[in-house]
Amino acid sequence: MSVIFNQAITILRARKTGSIYSTEQVDDWDNPIAIPVPFPVSIQPRGSTEGGVERQQVTRRWALYTPPGRDLDLRASDRVRLSTGSVLMVNGAPLHWPHPWKPEAVHHVEADLEVVDG
């Protein structure tokens, strides 16, 4: 195990379920699909922001990196559960960086994560 790639994670993906209000499928986060990731990743802090005085809110941002040569089926609609139990939301589409010498391969994946309190 590398010093920087030391976090075990599980991808949480919402199940699709019927809505009582329409015929469209909706996300069900009460019972998400848990997808274990078979290799450790790096989770690094990116900073935080605080809301105004009228609403106490803190948004903490993190960056996820996979080891070189590892692709990850992570979607913008997913969440990530850390081994500590913390659940972070994926913020935007994950970036699948191409390998510089193997055009058909992914070098690594980067994703922005965040958690909002308040």
How would you describe each model-predicted region?
Residues 1-26:
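Active-site-proximal polar cores
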Residues 24-118:
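Short, conserved turn/kink motifs that form compact alpha/beta structural patches or helix kinks used as
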